[in-house]
Every structure is written in structure tokens, then in C-alpha cells.
UniProtKB/Swiss-Prot annotation:
GO cellular component, one term: exodeoxyribonuclease VII complex
Organism superkingdom: Bacteria
Biological source species: Citrobacter koseri (strain ATCC BAA-895 / CDC 4225-83 / SGSC4696)
Family: Belongs to the XseB family.
Subunit structure: Heterooligomer composed of large and small subunits.
Any Pfam family hit: Exonuc_VII_S
Gene Ontology biological process terms, A to Z: DNA catabolic process
Keywords: Cytoplasm, Exonuclease, Hydrolase, Nuclease
Top-level class of the enzyme under EC nomenclature: hydrolase
GO molecular function: exodeoxyribonuclease VII activity
Annotated InterPro entries: Exonuc_VII_S (IPR003761), Exonuc_VII_ssu_sf (IPR037004)
Cellular location(s): Cytoplasm
Catalysed reactions, as listed in the record: Exonucleolytic cleavage in either 5'- to 3'- or 3'- to 5'-direction to yield nucleoside 5'-phosphates
Protein name stated in the entry: Exodeoxyribonuclease 7 small subunit
């Protein structure tokens, strides 16, 4: 597991760590100070994940703007 202030290697790693933190917090077995530390790390991971998603969305927009014939459409999983 990465150090507490270290950014995870990937979006998927951050998401996995965030899920583990949520599980530990939901168990209710953590002492208050440890729960606060875990919550703080979770907020940090969530923000990093959101930033990575925004960067990916910007890259997609740039790629689509290079091809003027293609227009961005909202993703709907039902179209698979």
C-alpha cells in the first residue's frame, strides 16, 4: 500500500484503496483518530481520482476536436 501522502500509481489503484478505506470506515471498528486519518486519505484519493477523470475527459475532447466530423455524445452503457 502506498504511503499515506503518496499519490497512487493509477486511477484504478486509487479507486481500490478508496474502496478499502470505505470498508474500514463502515465497519465502525476504528478508533476516532484513525478513522479521521482514513477519512482524510479517502478525501485526498477522491479528489485525485476526480482530477484524473477530468484530465481524461479533456484529452477525449481534444481528440474529438481534431476530428471536426465527430461530435462528443454522452456515454450511455445501454448502447453497447
Amino acid at each position: 500500500m502506498p504511503k499515506k501522502n503518496e499519490a497512487p500509481a493509477s486511477f484504478e489503484t486509487a479507486l481500490s484503496e478508496l474502496e478499502q478505506i470505505v470498508t474500514r470506515l463502515e465497519s465502525g471498528d476504528l478508533p476516532l483518530e484513525e478513522a479521521l486519518n482514513e477519512f482524510e486519505r479517502g478525501v485526498q484519493l477522491a479528489r485525485q481520482g476526480q482530477a484524473k477523470l477530468q484530465q481524461a475527459e479533456q484529452r477525449v475532447q481534444i481528440l474529438l476536436s481534431d476530428n471536426e466530423d465527430a461530435s462528443p455524445e454522452p456515454f450511455t452503457p445501454d448502447n453497447e
